[in-house]
């Protein structure tokens, strides 16, 4: 085992990386509220794991979506638990994200030189809410259907570009299969990819600049 470690150490300098991670200075004023960002990230990982598990059984069609969700809940081994974890961690992610934003704002963590860290955080907050909007419609029950109909109809009030925006969101004039397909693609591919990219940027900036000092 030692020879294997030495082989990797010689090429990747693993010990230097480990020392850098473990020796990062943590200011004495840091308390439990500074963990909210990490809790949000943990919830995101739970979302990815449980969501990936459900893609094996979920069918993104208006005719089969609701039945496939019912199948997950009643017939798939531990399916009810996987979906419940997905829902609970989604709610927890939104809650901890909001608390994290408030904590950063109230402690002045958005000030120079951390403006870009704040910007990436705000973008992540928007992406988190977008997860909720797109995921809410996927069971394609009455609640999900009318929710997506209302949400996609909001831009219609914008002059000139309102109607084209509604059609872009829905995939057609009315809510239907095209809408569900778009929301499924957003929820399972586009939003997770964007979130991963901005989280990486967010973490690298925090790593570079460190935790902000007290007010």
UniProtKB/Swiss-Prot annotation:
It comes from the Eukaryota. GO terms for cellular component: chloroplast thylakoid membrane. One of its GO terms (biological process) is respiratory electron transport chain. Its main location: plastid. Heme b 2 binds at residues 86, 187. The keyword Protein transport does not apply. It is a multi-pass membrane protein. The chain crosses the membrane at residues 32-52, 90-110, 116-136, 186-206. Belongs to the cytochrome b family. PetB subfamily. The 4 large subunits of the cytochrome b6-f complex are cytochrome b6, subunit IV (17 kDa polypeptide, PetD), cytochrome f and the Rieske protein, while the 4 small subunits are PetG, PetL, PetM and PetN. The complex functions as a dimer. This is Cytochrome b6. It comes from Coleochaete orbicularis (Charophycean green alga). The gene is petB.
């Amino acid at each position: 085992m030692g020879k294997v470690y030495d082989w990797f150490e010689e090429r990747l300098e693993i010990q230097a990386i480990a020392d850098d991670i473990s020796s990062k200075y943590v200011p004495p004023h840091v308390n439990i509220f500074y963990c909210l960002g990490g809790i949000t990230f943990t919830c995101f990982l739970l979302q990815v794991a449980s969501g990936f598990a459900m893609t094996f059984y979920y069918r993104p069609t208006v005719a089969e979506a609701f039945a496939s969700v019912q199948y997950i809940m009643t017939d798939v081994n531990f399916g009810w638990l996987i979906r419940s974890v997905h829902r609970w961690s989604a709610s927890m992610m939104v809650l901890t994200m909001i608390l994290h934003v408030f904590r950063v704002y109230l402690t002045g963590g958005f000030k120079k030189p951390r403006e870009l860290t704040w910007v990436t955080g705000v973008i992540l907050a928007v992406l988190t809410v977008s997860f909720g909007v797109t995921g809410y419609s996927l069971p394609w029950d009455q609640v999900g259907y009318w929710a997506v109909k209302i949400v996609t109809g909001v831009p219609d009030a914008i002059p000139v570009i309102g109607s084209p925006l509604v059609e872009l969101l829905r995939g057609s004039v009315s809510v239907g299969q095209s809408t569900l397909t778009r929301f499924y693609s957003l929820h399972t591919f586009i939003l997770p990819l964007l979130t991963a990219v901005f989280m990486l940027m967010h973490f690298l900036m925090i790593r570079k600049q460190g935790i902000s000092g007290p007010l």
